[in-house]
Amino acid sequence: MRIFKIVVLTKRSLILLITIFIFLLFISISLFIKINLLPANTFADPRSGIIVIDPGHGGVDGGTNKDGILEKEINLDVGRKLRLFLEQKGYKVIMTRDEDISLEALDNSAKSRHQRDLNARVNIINNSNAQLFVSIHVNCNLKKPSTDGAIVFYNNKYEQNKSLAYSIQKALNNIVVNNRKRTVHNPVQAKYFVLGNADIPGVIVETAFISNKSEREELVKGTFRENTATAIVSGIEQYLHESTNVSSPGQ
């Protein structure tokens, strides 16, 4: 014969158990949010279509250069073309700079001019309520001038960074120079300041190697810059389609 014990909870015990349950539930939810979710301003409306373009360098900072060709000028022109193509598709674009200037005057929190410039770019990105950002740069490898191709850099701070990097890299790898494809690269994980301090997904795109003679000749051509901007747009839209399943604003 089985004997069943009946446990009778007092009102005080019941309240205590409910309190403990609610506390544990709260802790679990808090940990889930902390581990899996991005900062609040990352969750911009996926249909808002805001994208930040960050043309690197500018003003007193010319960036890398070769044979009188300045990186800062290429970055700005590619950035403007990228803005045009994105706006034609219905996106709203915010530029960190739209002229030949550096941005250190917008920040006074550091002694170094270079650091103030970087801080200003991060502040613009983080206050944009954008879905993502793309920083435009030009690469250089004087020790191995034969190196060519576009390379996309990302930080592993957010999982979305890697997805965005791979989408843009895939599109850039298809650009043809002088009737041949350039070296196919994979995205590279990096700890650049802008990537590590941005509160939204983003990448740095090194469009080509100014140290490579063939690519240097292409970098000054409007067609190459347009093809680069077009490829970046394609990568952005592929990323947005895969991550949010939302059509571009113009569709």
What does each model-found stretch correspond to?
Residues 1-251:
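Catalytic-site microenvironment of enzymes
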